[in-house]
């Protein structure tokens, strides 16, 4: 098979399965409204959970940062790209989440890949929740360490895997809030089992940070768990982009030496770090509390109104509210019908989710109003 035949065959297989991904250019994709092709839609696809992407205080911080530092960092943090703006943000994140150190990364994907690549060796073992994010599972698959996957949130299965002989170290990997189902990991139980087998715990809390817990400190804080490695991202609750790894002083020093994604990538712009500091200030404030309370009320309203629809509603009290349809074509058709009636939703299909569980991944944000939820419910009931 020549290259073009290989590529064509892969694309054809996706088309036949109604699994071909497409991008839609939008004029505005975050916030309450999505604008595309000169049309305005209620936006139920954004991860901007607290509605901070258009917050004037955060926008102003980015603008002022650009005026002070320029629009780029100019290099890797190991050369000239580590600014005082980065340093202060790392210190504030570490203090907020109760860790000795924080290290900034350009994305959550890069952070997850970097940590696993740097930490794991051939004699070690990675034990990951089977529904962990693609960045975690891909990094584990590429690692020289063997990967074992435990059934979703099944602590008993995890314990059995950890109990089998391992010549090196064991790293347990999970998410705080799962990106496709919106449910939460039983982190306290997972940490107890991990510690019983002398392992370390790595939690990706991309969808919990900023959104749940006291001052938005996330899933681990809420469950009174402190993993050895905590990954937080800034494209969801923070409304910006980027990520950080929270850890001990010695682990941070180790990652600075061996995390190639960190060493060989241009740092995020200092202006972005300034915007993230402003976002963190909002998240920790009374306004942040009010936004989280509003989001919780919207979630309650939605779940109360969707119970009698002929779809499976995931066990989620997070901003992620998946309606599991099952069939790929049915999910695509339903998403299109909702768009025609003014609600922008996204159909998620395999391989992102398991076969037979195609879904509408609905996301609610603090930018929504109660009437927006009522409109979504009205449209769903009309197409159920």
Swiss-Prot record:
PROSITE patterns per record: AA_TRANSFER_CLASS_2
Pfam families for the chain: Aminotran_1_2
Record Gene3D superfamilies: Aspartate Aminotransferase, domain 1, Type I PLP-dependent aspartate aminotransferase-like (Major domain)
One Gene Ontology term from the biological process aspect of the record: biotin biosynthetic process
The EC number(s) this enzyme carries: 2.3.1.47
Keyword terms: Biotin biosynthesis, Pyridoxal phosphate, Transferase
Major enzyme class: transferase
Names of the cofactor(s): pyridoxal 5'-phosphate
The UniProt record lists the keyword Phosphoprotein: no
Binding site for pyridoxal 5'-phosphate: 108-109, 179, 207, 233
One annotated GO molecular function: pyridoxal phosphate binding
Keyword Transferase among UniProt keywords: yes
Coiled coil (residue ranges): none
Reactions catalysed: 6-carboxyhexanoyl-[ACP] + L-alanine + H(+) = (8S)-8-amino-7-oxononanoate + holo-[ACP] + CO2
Metabolic or biological pathway: Cofactor biosynthesis; biotin biosynthesis
Protein residues bound to substrate: 21, 133, 352
Quaternary state and interactors: Homodimer.
Similarity-based family: Belongs to the class-II pyridoxal-phosphate-dependent aminotransferase family. BioF subfamily.
Function, as annotated: Catalyzes the decarboxylative condensation of pimeloyl-[acyl-carrier protein] and L-alanine to produce 8-amino-7-oxononanoate (AON), [acyl-carrier protein], and carbon dioxide.
NCBIfam families (UniProt xref): bioF (TIGR00858)
Protein name as catalogued: 8-amino-7-oxononanoate synthase
Primary gene name: bioF
């Amino acid at each position: 098979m020549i290259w073009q035949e290989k590529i064509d065959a892969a694309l054809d297989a996706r088309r036949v399965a109604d699994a071909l991904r497409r991008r839609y250019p939008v004029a505005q994709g975050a916030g309450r409204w999505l604008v595309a092709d000169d049309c305005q839609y209620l936006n139920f696809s954004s991860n901007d959970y607290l509605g901070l992407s258009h917050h004037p205080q955060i926008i102003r911080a980015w603008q002022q940062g650009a005026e002070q530092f320029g629009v780029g960092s100019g290099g890797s943090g190991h050369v000239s790209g580590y600014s005082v703006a980065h340093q202060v943000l790392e210190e504030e994140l570490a203090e907020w989440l109760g860790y000795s150190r924080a290290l900034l990364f350009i994305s959550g994907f890069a952070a997850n890949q970097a940590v696993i690549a740097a930490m794991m060796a051939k004699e070690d073992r990675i034990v990951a929740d089977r529904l962990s994010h693609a960045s975690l599972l891909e990094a584990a698959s590429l690692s020289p360490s063997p990967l074992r996957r435990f059934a979703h949130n099944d602590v008993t299965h995890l314990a059995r895997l950890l109990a089998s002989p391992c010549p090196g170290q064991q790293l347990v990997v999970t998410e705080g809030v799962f990106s496709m189902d919106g449910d939460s990991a039983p982190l306290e139980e997972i940490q107890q089992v991990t510690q019983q087998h002398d392992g370390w715990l790595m939690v990706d809390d991309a969808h919990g940070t900023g959104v749940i817990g006291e001052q938005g400190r996330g899933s681990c804080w809420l469950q009174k768990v402190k993993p050895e490695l905590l990954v937080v991202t800034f494209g969801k609750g923070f409304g910006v982009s980027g990520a950080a790894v929270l850890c001990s002083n010695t682990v941070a020093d180790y990652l600075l030496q061996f995390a190639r994604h960190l060493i060989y990538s241009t740092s995020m712009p200092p202006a972005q770090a300034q915007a993230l500091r402003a976002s963190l200030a909002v998240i920790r404030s009374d306004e942040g509390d009010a936004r989280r309370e509003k989001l919780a009320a919207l979630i309650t309203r939605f779940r109360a109104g969707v119970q009698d629809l002929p779809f499976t509603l995931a066990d989620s009290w997070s901003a992620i509210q998946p309606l599991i349809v099952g069939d790929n074509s049915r999910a695509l058709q339903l998403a299109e019908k909702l768009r025609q009636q003014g609600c922008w939703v996204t159909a998620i299909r395999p391989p992102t989710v398991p076969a037979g569980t195609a879904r509408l991944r609905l996301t609610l944000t603090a930018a929504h109003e109660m009437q927006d939820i009522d409109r979504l419910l009205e449209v769903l009931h009309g197409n159920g």
